[in-house]
Amino acid sequence: MEEKGREILREAASEQGYTSIAINKDGKHVGGCFIPWKLTSSAINMKTPRVTLAVEDLQDEAIMADVKKCKVLGCYIMIPLEDYSFVQQFHELCDLFILYGKNISDLSFVQDMPNLFLFYLEDAKLTDIRPLIDNCRRSNSLTGKRFGFYHCEIQDTSAMKDADFMISELLIWPPEGQTDEKERWLNGRHISGFRIYD
């Protein structure tokens, strides 16, 4: 982590304030990330992340203690990780953005995040998306949810039938060879912002 980022994190931790974090290999500051959403007015990641952690910082007790004191609104993971369970502690999280999620086989780390409304994931191999749907069902927020799955192999999408909340955008970039994505994801529902990218 760069020293300026460490100072920003210390200050946010001392105030128990809001912040957003990126995670990359070397901890060099990331000024932002691409925004997949068509309607970007609701994207909170336009001016964030404020702090960038290196992968090794996730094992640093002092740094992670400061992260835990903050209200993390956005988490942008730019590198494959072995373990994503640390995300569970971000109860204020609104935006979770994961590139290179090839080590993700389930979404059990997505829980107790009542404000989560932006979720983007790449390259994961998932059994299902039930934890994400259940998390959003427990939300009191009226904000429309936006989900993006890029080249994710997802065996079972039937949890979408239980999505009794507004989905503003559902973006699917199917893995090569998958052709039944519309039927699998919509399950008879109408989602105005549904797009498949072949």
Where are these regions (language model features)?
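Extreme N-terminal leader/targeting regions
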Residues: 5-9
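Short intrinsically disordered terminal tails
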Residues: 1-2
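Concave beta-strand-loop units of leucine-rich repeat
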Residues: 14-63, 69-82, 86, 92-105, ...
